[in-house]
Structure formats: structure tokens, C-alpha cells
């Protein structure tokens, strides 16, 4: 099980969802120097995207100064696959199970990244409107995407309100990432439930 680390300090609403997912993938498969040797073909297969989509996303990341592309050549001067270096930026560092992250839809990945950038080591409270503005999508989309992340067991979401603060009970969500031990416990419980359903009475 690989872990996904991200250290980003940018407003991801300026990036397309596919660019965010490609950036996360390159980070997860980079060495200690931040360099990824994955070829375009292998990356497209892993992410389930076309080569033209890959090219557009990579072009967006290079223009934003987040990824540097360096050509490689063999001893005969023939070009090999490029290397991709993720430029380190200041920001929060967070971790998630890469197996889970790779399965996220592009838009789920964008919302997940925005939440994780803010969540830090504890929890983070935000209104649906604020999260929608940060991600550049509608409040309805945020509700649907957050529910999907919650149902996949990636986020712990708790609805709260500020009625005690005298602001007419404005509602907001508090997000907390599951720790590895909690994820393991949740998966064990799920397996036990599935096993009990398959056991004849």
C-alpha cells in the first residue's frame, strides 16, 4: 500500500480536475528528488485518460510552474520517455492511501485536494458555499462530491451549525481525514458485515 503525499500551496480552482489528478499521480510516483519516470502511455492507462487529455493537463501544469519536463536520450541519441519533476511548493503536507486516491473521479480529486490542503493535522470546518467557491463549482456539485468521498470512506464528515453564535444557525461541514488505523478498522468491520450477509442462516 503506497501513501500519497502532497505539498501544494495554490488555489486549485485555477486548475482543471484532470490536471489536479495528474499532479497528484506524478507526486505519488516520484522519487526523493520529486522526479517521476512514468511514461505517458503507462500514466494514461493508470488514470484512465486519453493521451490528448494527458497532454492538455501536463501543458497546464508546466505553464503553472508546477511540473518540469526533461527529455531523456539513450547512448545512441534516441529519445526515451521524458522525466517529470514536481516542483516543491510551500504548503500543508497530508497523506492518504494512494490506492484510494487513484480511484477518485477527477472532480472528486479536486474537492478532496482542496479539503486536504486546509485540514492539516486536525479537522477543518467550512460552509458549502466557501468550498464551492474555492473549487470553482456549484454548491449542488459540492454536496454530491463530498457525499461520494464520505461513502468511499476517505473523509469523515460531520454536519454542524453556528446557532449558538447568533448567526441564524448557518450550517457548515466539519471534515476530518481518517487515520490509517481507523481505515483498517472500518475495512475490517465492512468485511465482517459482508461475510455475515453471505453466511446462510
What label would you give each PLM region?
Residues 1-201:
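Electropositive, intrinsically flexible nucleic-acid-contacting patches
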